């Protein structure tokens, strides 16, 4: 079985639940998930002031990963969009039909990069007006073409399972072990 890899982006102001939980779930599925930061300082500070040590500094190495993940956070989208090298990397992933995943405000970053054009996507409440090039779907997680999107801080589980699905990974055993259905999962 192929070993997949995921590059999860982290920038100051990231939404902790959307970032840490995704890394955890993907690693449980056997995905080599690494967090990437945009500064030399190894610790990135989340929205709730949680300091998380990122694995690596953002570089061209990200292009070697099977999927790039853009979590949300109120102040993150503008920072990601302002980073030309990062935006070019998203465009490169899209042009090369590699998997791109974004949730919450991260979906607006995908929109700004032109990744969502003509694809079904979802995002945070009220983002239908922001994701204008996409066909907006009111669902917790959506997979279309080479893009996975999700709504917000309470949806990392369905988001991670959609990423697994897109990679061809059966997440049902993980779902069972984590008691997702017993906890009321509806994805």
Stretches with model-predicted labels:
Residues 14-18, 43:
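Short N-terminal binding/cap micro-motifs at the start of the first secondary-structure element
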Residues 36-55:
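N-terminal beta-loop-helix "entrance" segment that forms/cooperates
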Residues 21-22:
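Short amphipathic alpha-helix
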Residues 3-10, 14, 25-37, 55-56, ...:
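Active-site-adjacent pocket-lining segments in enzyme domains
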């Amino acid at each position: 079985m192929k070993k997949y890899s995921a590059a999860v982006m982290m920038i100051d102001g990231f939404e902790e639940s959307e970032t840490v939980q995704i890394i955890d779930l993907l690693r449980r599925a056997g995905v080599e998930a690494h967090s990437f930061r945009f500064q030399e300082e190894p610790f990135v500070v989340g929205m709730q002031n949680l300091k998380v040590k990122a694995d690596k500094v953002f570089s061209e190495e990200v292009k070697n990963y099977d999927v790039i993940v853009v979590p949300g956070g109120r102040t993150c989208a503008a920072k990601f969009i302002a980073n030309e090298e990062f935006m070019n990397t998203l465009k490169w992933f899209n042009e090369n039909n590699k998997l791109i995943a974004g949730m919450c405000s991260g979906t607006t970053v995908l929109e700004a990069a032109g990744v969502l054009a003509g694809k079904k996507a979802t995002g945070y409440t009220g983002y239908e007006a922001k994701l204008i090039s996409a066909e907006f779907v009111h669902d917790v997680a959506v997979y279309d073409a080479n893009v996975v999107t999700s709504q917000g801080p309470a949806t990392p589980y369905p988001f991670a399972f959609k990423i697994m699905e897109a990679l061809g990974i059966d997440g049902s055993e993980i779902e069972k072990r984590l008691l997702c259905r017993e906890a009321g999962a509806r994805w």
